[in-house]
Amino acid sequence: MWGGTCQKQSWRNSSQTLSSCLISRLDHIVMTVKSIKDTTMFYSKILGMEVTTFKGNRKALCFGDQKLNLHEVGKEFEPKAAHPVPGSLDICLITEVPLEEMVQHLKACEVPIEEGPVPRTGAKGPIMSIYFRDPDRNLIEVSNYIPS
């Protein structure tokens, strides 16, 4: 599969480039949080994510074909990021729910909106986005793709 393109050669010094990406999709992201309980409550109540338990008592938030694995600060699992800290995540989530409904839902749940709706550029084209923060102060962007 690798075709020997990087054999015994530092990737930093390599002039080789691939003709296509080797990665097909994102599977999961690990979030380091202050409180698993507060995080699971927020994401399940506010965004409707499913809380799942795996490998003993580890927790994840599932949505679509993705998940957010949760590590509590100071109790991370190995291997882990070099500097795992709560509040360092900035992610964009796509919803089919109209943003105006999301805005009303967030207001009803007393989640302050930091910005939006505002136009942005998503991975597949123009999006309309709103921004708010979770209990760890991670920046959460929820967006609708703008029909072309």
UniProtKB/Swiss-Prot annotation:
Source domain of life: Eukaryota
A Pfam family per the record: Glyoxalase
CDD domains noted in UniProt: GLOD5
Domain VOC: residue ranges: 25-145
InterPro entries reported in the protein's UniProt record: Glyas_Bleomycin-R_OHBP_Dase (IPR029068), Glyas_Fos-R_dOase_dom (IPR004360), GlyoxalaseI/FosfomycinResist (IPR050383), VOC (IPR037523)
Disulphide bond pairs: none
PANTHER family listed in its UniProt record: GLYOXALASE DOMAIN-CONTAINING PROTEIN 5, GLYOXALASE FAMILY PROTEIN
Stated family: Belongs to the glyoxalase I family.
Protein name, entry field: Glyoxalase domain-containing protein 5
Protein species of origin: Canis lupus familiaris (Dog)
